[in-house]
Amino acid sequence: MKHKILQYAKDMTAGRLARGFDHCNRVYHTAKQLEDEYDDELLYAATYLHDIILAEPHQLQSAEKAEAVLHEVGFTPGKIELVKEAILSHIPEGEPSFKEAMMLHDADILDSLGMVGITRLAVGAFFWKGAKSLSGVLDLINEYKDRAKSRLLLPRSRKLAEEKIEFMERALKQLEKELALPESDEG
């Protein structure tokens, strides 16, 4: 069952930079660090299938596609509904209502922090938000970073975020410094 889910996730996310298979894999392995006891089958399916569709609203599209995939691999209807709910609530503004959904939610946010986060958000700033300059990218990354910690739900998530946010603040301060060059005189 896991093999089929993994292969499907690889096939659906191949060639993507910010929301590709590597992201899903990091989210799964990060999520496992956030709680000691959880339903691994549920967490596995939700994390590997949460970004399989990019069309917005991607959480809705991914949840619908996940339902078909999980039905095909033999998940029970009740577990399919839980996976869908986790996927639907994984976005930063989401309000997950059970442990595995909170784990996915927080791990997804954590993957947008630190150096990986800076890289993912820079890609996203251009492709999803239409940033036209490095200054625009910097603004979007700072905005996300500033909101991220308050959206984390689990104690271990907040602890993991601290080091990542500290790194981001140093790196973004350096980027801001490098971008703050005066325009050359035309004289």
Task: Name each region found by the language model.
Residues 40-58, 62, 66, 82-92:
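His-Asp-centered metal-binding catalytic motifs of divalent-metal-dependent phosphohydrolases/nucleases
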Residues 32-33, 67-71:
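Short glycine/serine- and small hydrophobic-enriched flexible loop segments
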Residues 1-15:
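Extreme N-terminal tail/first-helix region
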Residues 72-79:
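Short helix-capping segments at alpha-helix termini
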